Amino acid sequence: LVPFKYDWAWQKYLDGSANHWMPQEINMTNDIVLWKSEDGLTEDERTIVKRNLGFFSTADSLVANNLVLALYRLITNPECRQYILRQSLEEAIHTHAYQYCIESLGMDEGEIFNMYREIPCVARKASWGLKYTKEISNPDFKTGTEETDKQLLKNLIAFYCVLEGIFFYCGFTQILSMGRRNKMTGTAEQFQYILRDESMHVNFGIDVINQIKIENPHLWDEEMKAEAAQMILEGTELEIMYARDTMPRGVLGMNAAMMEEYLKFIANRRLTQIGLEEEFKGVSNPFPWMSEIIDLRKEKNFFETRVTEYQVGGALNWE
């Protein structure tokens, strides 16, 4: 491992390890009572919870498969691999968290786990991600030519900028907004930890993409730039459709039009993070509290159940 070529990758591995958490540490009692009471949640709120658990339980498996079957094999730098292994563990924890929520709330598992086949707005997102992992997950796929190197780059953009960087944001915002209104606070706390992990995954992926561009400038030609921008725009459109489908009437403090603006704001960020121009002019962030959660550091979380920045693994420095 030493000397490190990419200090940023090792630092993210250390930070991710220090932020370790497990789903069963979070109390789900209030969520269970609320979910089972007849007038606890509106039908629209129930739809939001079920759709998101259905999408996320499938999506994190998709991300984990891509990491283990493709990226770990194709990215050979030791400290980047170390972080990819850390991320793989976190994806397993996230899948565990969704399962824990589904079981705690006594949901119909068949209904939830089949959404990626039966609910069109969920299915479209899952199949969009699959098309970018299919070829590079093949054990015979090798990088080393301009064409295959570009395929790897497209996979990184698809999974880090779009799947984790856009497809997760409507659902995170919906669930965390419910938590802010003191509804489904256990589920929202699980999602808060997951969002913190996912933010680091996205940052790692963007660092890898930008490092590949620096070391292989010939890959980042006009055609590739146009394709990368197109992928981010396609992902944004799919997520806007998902927002409209999960919020046909809106819920307190949030509706599909606000979510559309937020997703365009996020898309602009993803574009600029990989060196492309913003595509949506004049959009702002209608949910500034989301940025506060993503950037939360060393303070008690807004559900006041436990310290969000609690760390394990000897990461505290004693004076």
Model-based region annotation:
Residues 1-36:
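Amphipathic alpha-helical packing elements
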Residues 38, 42-319:
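Non-heme di-metal
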